[in-house]
Amino acid sequence: MKPLGTPLSPDATRVMLLGSGELGKEVLIALQRLGVETIAVDRYDNAPGQQVAHQSHTIAMSDPAALRTLIEAERPDLVVPEIEAIATQTLEALEAEGVVRVIPTARATRLTMDREGIRRLAAETLGLPTSPYRFCDSLAELQAAIDGADGQPAIGYPCIVKPVMSSSGKGQSKIDGPADVQAAWDYAMVGGRVSNGRVIVEGFIDFDYEITQLTVRALGADGQVETHFCDPIGHVQVRGDYVESWQPHPMQPAALALSRHIARTVTDNLGGQGLFGVELFVKGDLVWFSEVSPRPHDTGMVTMITQWQNEFELHARAILGLPVSTALKSPGASAVIYGGVDAPGVVYDGVDEALRVPNSEIRLFGKPESFERRRMGVALVHDADVDVARTQAKLAAGKVKARPA
C-alpha cells in the first residue's frame, strides 16, 4: 500500500465497501480512524454504513455493468466486499485489468459467494473434513439425495437444507423426516439471495458445539503474510441465524489445534490479506469445516468488548498492511437485539435500563426499517466469567424494545 493520506484530498487512501450493513459500518469506522476516505455502497438507501461514510452510492451490486461503472468512476485503492450478492466476475475482471485491488482477492470473493464454491474447495480440493453433502436443483433431486440414488450414499435423516446463496440463516431448515422435505424446499426457494433454485443438503452432525475461528492474514515486519488467530468464539444459531456469541469458548488442546489447522489451510488457499470468519463444528477432538467468510463475521461482534483490537479493526489494519494483535482484553458475550415489529424509522425504549446492566454496552445499527426478526442491534457484556457475561448480555438485549415512531 502507498502511505496513508488525508481524506478528501488528492493523496487520500480510498476504500470502497460493497455492502454497508452493521458489519460494514464498523469496518468503515475503523478505516476512518486510520485516516482512510471511505465509500459505502449498498442496494438500499440509508444503510448503516452509508450513514457514516464520506461518500455513498445505492446500486444493484449484482449488476455487472452498474458495478463496473461505479468502480471505474470512483477508482478506489481497495474494494472490500461485505456481502455475497455481488457480480464477482466483474471484480475478477477489474482486478485482472489492474483497475482495483479486491480484498482479500477477487478469487476468494467468488469462491465464498455461495456455499457450493467454498464447500467444493474445502472438501474436494483441500480434503478438509465436512458433513456429507449434495447439491440439488429440484425437489426430486433433494429427495433422491436424502434417500440415496444413482449409486450415491443416502444423506439420510435428519439433514440440513440451505440455499446455495443466503445470509443470516435465511432459507435454512432441518429435515427430520419425509414430511418435512416439501416445506424445507419451499423455504429455501424464498430464502435465497438469488432465484436459481439450487440448494445444498447436508448430513446432520451431532456436534458438541460450534465455533467461529477468526483468522487474520496480515503482513509481518518482513513484509510477508503471517496468520494470526483470535481466541475461539462460541455461538448459538437458530435456523442458521446468530443469536448470541461469547469469547473465549473453552476447547481441548487437540480440538483447538485441529480447528486452527483447518482455518489456516482454507485461508492460505484463499490468500490475500484481511480477516476471515471460519465456522467449525466440534465433537470431542473431532472438527468439521462448515463455512468461511472472507470478512468480519456476525458472531465476531463480541470482540467489540473482548479484544483490544476488535474484528473490524483487525480487518482494517490487515488490508492496509498494518500490524495486528489478537490479544484478549476480557472474556465477554454478545446477544442480538431484534426489531420485534415491522415498521420504518423505529424508536428504542429501554436503552437506559440495558446500560444499567453491569459491564454492558449497546450498539444500535441504525437500520432504516425494522422487521420482527431483523437484527437491529447487539448487547455486549464483559465479565471474568463467560457464563455470567452470557446471562447478562441476554438480559441487556431483552430490555431494548423497538416501536414505531
Swiss-Prot record:
Mg(2+) binds at E279, E291. It catalyses: N(1)-(5-phospho-beta-D-ribosyl)glycinamide + formate + ATP = N(2)-formyl-N(1)-(5-phospho-beta-D-ribosyl)glycinamide + ADP + phosphate + H(+). InterPro entries: ATP-grasp, ATP-grasp_carboxylate-amine, ATP_grasp_subdomain_1, PreATP-grasp_dom_sf, PurT, PurT/PurK_preATP-grasp, PurT_C, Rudment_hybrid_motif. This is Formate-dependent phosphoribosylglycinamide formyltransferase. Belongs to the PurK/PurT family. N(1)-(5-phospho-beta-D-ribosyl)glycinamide binds at E22, L23, E82, D298, K367, R374, R375. Residues 120-320 form the ATP-grasp domain. It is an enzyme of class 6 (ligase). The keyword Flavoprotein does not apply. Keywords: ATP-binding, Ligase, Magnesium, Metal-binding, Nucleotide-binding, Purine biosynthesis. Homodimer. GO terms for biological process: 'de novo' IMP biosynthetic process. Coiled coil: none annotated.
